[in-house]
Amino acid sequence: MASLSGPISPTNLEMFKPGVEELNPSKLLLLSNHQEGMLYPTILGSLELLSFKRERSLNLQRDKVCLLHQESQLLKLRGTGTDTTDVLLKQPMATSVNCCHDGIFTIWEQDRMPKTSMAPTLTESSGSLVTRLMSIPRLTFSIGTQVAMRLFRLGFRLARYSLRVTILKAQEGLLLIPDLLHAHPVEPLVQDRVVEPILATEPLPLV
């Protein structure tokens, strides 16, 4: 065995060379065609690295590739009061040609993406809501009043207390409706309508 302190011959240098398997151009072409859609460069190395890339490419071919390169467009909308939740869900699935090197995530199927926005949407304005609430037949209120008075006369303390609280909160809401209409202008029909608070015809009995 040659001494380590002496000069190292070329034959001894062969012992320190890492074992790298050379690949012919035809095999490299086959690998590049097989790894279609992958944007990382092919590095000549051991077969373990190539087998890892081959397995990863098969998994990506089975999945659909979704990109994050359009995030920069959404960042421009941030701070302007624009809700980007719906925009994120409606971004089309891009092809592998536009893949970013550092931002790739995969999903199983594109069809399983939620089609609707998760943000709550208002289906009607406050004016139409007030109009709909005030168009409830008076028969409903009369029936409720009769039931409440019967429960008051029966003497159930808990029922009387609950009904009294409910009636007081309803009267408070009716008193606040005109102020809310002036503070928040809505449709002209609601603005022109005179909203008068409904006063109780009988004093509420004490609980």
Curated annotation (Swiss-Prot):
InterPro entries: Corona_nucI, N2-like_embe-CoV. GO terms for cellular component: virion component. It comes from the Viruses. Disulfide bonds: none annotated. CDD domains: embe-CoV_Protein-I_like (cd21662). Keywords: Virion. It is found in: Virion. Structural protein that is not essential for the viral replication either in tissue culture or in its natural host. Belongs to the coronavirus I protein family. The gene encoding this protein is included within the N gene (alternative ORF). This is Protein I. The gene is N.
